[in-house]
């Protein structure tokens, strides 16, 4: 963009002012912001259901938020570009600041999944109307509200009932329940022997169904001993095994845990670092597909890997990018 002149909290140049958010600059306020009596955890006050959401600014984010508000109101600024992460949370981070600043200037959206210079330039050449992502913003607000309602009310309820702080969350609690159920299943599991009759005919082995009674399996074995077997029919099928899809964050986290023993957070930290170094696409996604504008880049990258990396030897043909976009 040519914004190379460094200022206090932003960059300037070539008609652009470029600044940044440091995570969420606005957060949903705690219950006591709605009523002072909510400062104490009491059963009688539940459920707490705000009619309109209030937001508060973390102390360490006040300076940057004030700067962004000032820049949006700058008379030199005639439009605003949202360039946060291409996802629900990125949309929420920007929109809350935009609304908090009372900004009504035209807003456009930079939607890219790569930090490469070419991808960024391409994205700025094809900015989209901010209104295209209104539903995404609505979804983010709903997610944040649901987390607040369940987390605040359920945590206070169970903490008051049991006399100890018990944290409850929309995602955390069901996940914990799955772990508890799995652990319970493992502890209560009782192994039982089973038997599978098999017939070996040269290089071919035919297997029967599992049996829990040894006597049944023994009877089949005795009936087959010293007798001949006949192949009555042969059915041949040609099957195509599709290659796996691209990774989304959850799939990648599972794979890295299985192979390397990484925690989910470790995997996210590593792939986030790769993303910032322009070596991976946007990681915080549940999609296993690339956007259409990445087709050419993806194809050229695969061809380069095929021609220059040891594992590419023997690969032939052209990559079918349509499968992953």
What spans do the regions from the language model cover?
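A generic secondary-structure signal for well-formed alpha-helical elements
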Residues: 100-105, 128, 153, 157, ...
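Amphipathic alpha-helical segments of the small helical/lid subdomains adjacent to P-loop NTPase cores
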Residues: 139-169
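Intrinsically disordered, low-complexity regulatory segments
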Residues: 1-144, 148, 317
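Short glycine-centered, acidic/aromatic-flanked micro-motifs in structured strand/loop junctions
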Residues: 84, 254, 284
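Extended, highly charged linker/hinge segments and catalytic-adjacent loops that couple domains
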Residues: 133, 137-138, 149, 270, ...
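Alpha-helix capping and helix-loop boundary segments enriched in small/acidic/polar residues
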Residues: 84, 111, 133, 243-244, ...
């Amino acid at each position: 963009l040519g914004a190379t002149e460094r200022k206090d909290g932003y960059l300037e140049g070539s008609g652009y002012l470029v600044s940044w958010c440091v995570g969420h600059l606005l957060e949903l306020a705690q219950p006591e912001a709605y009523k002072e009596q909510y400062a104490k955890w009491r059963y009688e006050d539940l459920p707490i259901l705000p009619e309109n959401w209030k937001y508060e600014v973390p102390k360490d984010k006040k300076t940057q938020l004030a700067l962004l508000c000032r820049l949006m109101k700058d008379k030199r600024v005639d439009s605003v570009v949202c360039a946060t992460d291409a996802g629900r949370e990125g949309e929420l981070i920007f929109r809350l600041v935009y609304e908090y600043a009372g900004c009504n200037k035209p807003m456009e959206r930079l939607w890219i999944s790569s930090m490469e210079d070419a991808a960024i330039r391409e994205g700025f050449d094809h900015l989209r109307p901010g209104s295209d992502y209104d539903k995404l913003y609505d979804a983010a607000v709903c997610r944040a509200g649901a987390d607040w309602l369940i987390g605040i009310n359920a945590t206070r309820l169970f903490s008051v009932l049991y006399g100890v702080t018990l944290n409850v969350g929309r995602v955390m609690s069901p996940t914990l329940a799955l772990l508890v159920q799995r652990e319970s299943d493992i502890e209560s599991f009782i192994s039982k022997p089973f038997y599978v009759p098999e017939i070996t005919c040269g290089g071919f082995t035919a297997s029967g169904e599992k049996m829990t009674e040894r006597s049944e399996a023994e009877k089949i074995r005795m009936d087959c001993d010293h007798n001949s077997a006949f192949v009555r029919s042969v059915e041949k099928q040609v099957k195509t095994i599709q290659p796996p899809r691209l990774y989304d964050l959850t799939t990648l986290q599972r794979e890295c845990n299985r192979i390397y023993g990484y925690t989910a957070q470790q995997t996210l930290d590593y792939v986030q670092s790769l993303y910032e170094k322009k070596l991976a696409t946007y990681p915080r996604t549940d999609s296993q597909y690339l956007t259409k504008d990445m087709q050419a880049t993806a194809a050229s990258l695969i061809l380069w890997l095929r021609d220059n990396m040891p594992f590419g030897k023997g690969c032939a043909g052209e990559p079918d990018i349509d499968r992953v976009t």
